[in-house]
Amino acid sequence: MAEIEQSMIDEMKDGFPLFDNKGDGKIDGAQLGDVLRSFGLNPSNAEVEKIAKANEGKRLSFDDYLAIHKQVLGQGEVGSYEDFFEGLKLFDKEGTGLISGAELRHVLATLGEKLTEAQVDELMAGGGGQEDAEGNVNYDTFAKYLMLG
């Protein structure tokens, strides 16, 4: 199980009561996605649904929450370069190694874990999403950029 620094645990312990809507020192299982994200994790919607379903109807203490937090922290899914490359290659209709910047923006905002427009802008502004003069992006470079974190 992933370890968390004591300072982060203390910070979470201080913030945990903000989600306690009944004053019993516990949170609803349905709130887990919000709580996880507020404490710096970014689980996928599918992960949140799975966790919430497993804890449906339950009230969770801080210790219960901390165990879930550690579990999610330890299983953060990161795709491989090959996963990103092959996924983006599907949009290279002409086999040039390039995809339309507009199409890439659309894919990032509408498929899988949907990104906000601000998140898409941030990704595209980074080194890997630079569009050429024709508005195309080299998806090999973009996939490598994604792997940098």
Curated annotation (Swiss-Prot):
Coiled coil regions in record: none
Record-linked Gene3D superfamilies: EF-hand
Chain ranges of the EF-hand domain: 7-42, 79-114
A GO cellular-component term linked to this record: myosin II complex
Keywords: Motor protein, Myosin, Repeat
Domain of life according to the entry: Eukaryota
Name of the featured protein: Myosin, essential light chain
Gene source species: Branchiostoma floridae (Florida lancelet)
Taxonomic lineage from the root: Eukaryota, Metazoa, Chordata, Cephalochordata, Leptocardii
